[in-house]
A protein has these predicted regions:
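Transmembrane-helix motifs of polytopic, lipid-linked glycan transferases
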Residues: 2-13
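Membrane-embedded helix bundles of polyisoprenyl
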Residues: 20-35, 44-52, 73
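Membrane-interface transmembrane helices that cradle and orient dolichyl/undecaprenyl
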Residues: 53-68
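Membrane-interface alpha helices of multi-pass inner-membrane proteins
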Residues: 69-85
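Perimembrane helix-loop-helix junctions
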Residues: 90-114
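Juxtamembrane membrane-water interface segments that cap and precede transmembrane helices
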Residues: 138-160
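Membrane-interface helix-loop-helix junctions at transmembrane boundaries of multi-pass membrane enzymes
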Residues: 174-201
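Single conserved hydrophobic/aromatic residue that forms the stacking wall/gate
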Residues: 210-219
């Protein structure tokens, strides 16, 4: 599902100038060679919500009435953070990028705030009605828990190899965007700069051994 949404995201916003299947093939190759990714984890649900959030953030680009787009973007960030609480940290980056996309106003900021809190309102109602308040407190406790910085010994070899490969791909791709960015439209350059910032932001939680995706499979 995540691979399909990545394809649609690229086709909808024209992030890559030339239509090709290489980037999709690489993604599916990475999934294939990682046995632990063949099961459905809570982090997979969070990843899909994350992609929906990016979609609506991109839709808000230079929109005069962007409150609705930011509401839905932060709604999915909030929903995903219930499964992976550290997604909440991306709210700061989302607000910064919304400002760069010229879509952040007081009204859209309020829409974003309401969107993020709505999943927690629903979670609170469920937890209160069934007397399971620990379910509501759990994401906030996870959010405030950090592991050791740069303690990579807890990672398995295939995890280190995957992270290293992704980092090399990021360096090459980011360098290409900087060198050949003048060939893209202004909107596309803004999207690509967002993806570069997002990738740098993603490597921050990787530095903390505790901030890994939930490892309890659903199936």
């Amino acid at each position: 599902a995540a691979g399909y949404f990545l394809i649609e995201l690229n086709n909808r916003f024209g992030i890559i100038r030339m239509r090709a299947s290489v980037q999709t093939a690489i993604y599916f190759l990475l999934v294939t060679v990682c046995p632990e990714m063949h099961l459905l984890y809570a982090g997979d649900v969070a990843a899909i919500a994350f992609l929906f959030s990016i979609y609506f953030l991109f839709k808000s680009y230079q929109q005069s009435q962007a409150a609705g787009y930011l509401f839905y973007s932060f709604l999915f960030i909030g929903a995903g953070s219930i499964f992976f609480p550290q997604l909440t940290f991306f709210s700061v980056l989302w607000l910064f990028e919304a400002y760069r996309f010229q879509s952040l106003t007081f009204r859209s900021f309020c829409g974003a705030l309401i969107g993020w809190t709505m999943p927690y309102w629903m979670l609170f109602g469920h937890a209160f009605f069934y007397d399971q308040m620990e379910l509501f407190y759990h994401p906030f406790r996870e959010l405030a828990t950090f592991g050791d910085l740069l303690n990579l010994q807890v990672l398995q070899p295939w995890e280190l190899a995957t992270l290293g490969y992704l980092f090399v791909l990021f360096i090459v791709s980011a360098a290409h965007c900087v060198v050949a960015g003048f060939e893209d439209k202004i909107r596309t350059r803004a999207y690509l700069q967002f993806l570069i910032d997002l990738t740098l932001f993603l490597f921050i939680p990787v530095s903390y051994t505790h901030l890994t995706l939930p490892t309890t499979p659903y199936v």
